[in-house]
């Protein structure tokens, strides 16, 4: 079964220092709408709205967080691409049936209370892809 994505939800950008990153992005003319800590993911998130899309600046809150490990290995930069979907559970099941390598077989709670799940980059041409279901 082929399913449609709703749209790009956000681009996640890993940063070493959230305050410094906010100054840079605000200097470009963007406005941070909210800052939130997601303890379960060991990350602090600054949300910049760009039309219907978002940029999320991601700062690690612990040395063992996925963002800290990413920065240590690759440096600051684009961490993931998030796609807005409906019924994330069925999307994950479909991808699993098709043989995609899933980091999350079941959704978890992300920033803003969204249901999220990641697909492994080895299954998606080297891109960490996040599926994201939000209440409209």
Swiss-Prot record:
Q: What class of enzyme is it?
A: isomerase
- Residues reported to bind Co(2+): 10, 80, 130
Organism annotation: Pyrococcus horikoshii (strain ATCC 700860 / DSM 12428 / JCM 9974 / NBRC 100139 / OT-3)
Query: Which keywords has UniProt assigned to this entry?
Result: Cobalt, Isomerase, Metal-binding
How does this protein's activity vary with temperature? Highly thermostable: is fully active after 60 minutes at 100 degrees Celsius and loses less than 10 per cent of its activity after 100 minutes at the same temperature.
* Family under the similarity heading: Belongs to the methylmalonyl-CoA epimerase family.
Q: What PROSITE patterns is this protein classified in?
A: VOC
GO terms classed as biological process: L-methylmalonyl-CoA metabolic process
User: What EC number(s) would the UniProt record show?
Assistant: 5.1.99.1
Q: What is this protein called?
A: Methylmalonyl-CoA epimerase
GO MF, one term, reads: methylmalonyl-CoA epimerase activity
Xref: NCBIfam families: metmalonyl_epim
Could you tell me which residue ranges the VOC domain spans?
7-134
Signal peptide region: none
Kindly give the InterPro entries that the UniProt entry links to this protein.
Answer: Glyas_Bleomycin-R_OHBP_Dase, MeMalonyl-CoA_epimerase, MMCE/EMCE_epimerase, VOC
Q: Which reaction(s) does its UniProt entry say it catalyses?
A: (R)-methylmalonyl-CoA = (S)-methylmalonyl-CoA
Q: Which domain of life is it from?
A: Archaea
**Annotated Pfam families:** Glyoxalase_4 (PF13669)
